[in-house]
Amino acid sequence: MTQVTVGENEGIESALRRFKRQVSKSGIFADLKRLRHHETPVEKYKRKLQQRRKARRR
């Protein structure tokens, strides 16, 4: 769960930017998009293959 605490002198805009950054780094939206539709075994294999290639490059 992503949480952002707003400081006393902090504007809501900067807190919202921090929240959006945390959500994008955690990959929540990517998971939601992936789980929105049924994934065939071939698609799952291709996705995992891409993840392995990306991890190997790092």
Curated annotation (Swiss-Prot):
Q: Which keywords label this protein?
A: Ribonucleoprotein, Ribosomal protein
Q: Please name the Pfam families in this protein's record.
A: Ribosomal_S21
Gene3D superfamilies to which the protein is assigned, alphabetical: Ribosomal protein S8
The gene that this protein is the product of is: rpsU
| GO terms, biological process | translation
The protein's GO terms of the molecular function aspect are: structural constituent of ribosome
Report TM segments. Answer: none
- What is the name attached to this protein's record? Small ribosomal subunit protein bS21
- PROSITE patterns found in the cross-reference section: RIBOSOMAL_S21
Q: What GO cellular component term, any one, is given?
A: ribosome
Q: The organism sits in which domain of life?
A: Bacteria
Family, according to the entry, reads as follows: Belongs to the bacterial ribosomal protein bS21 family.
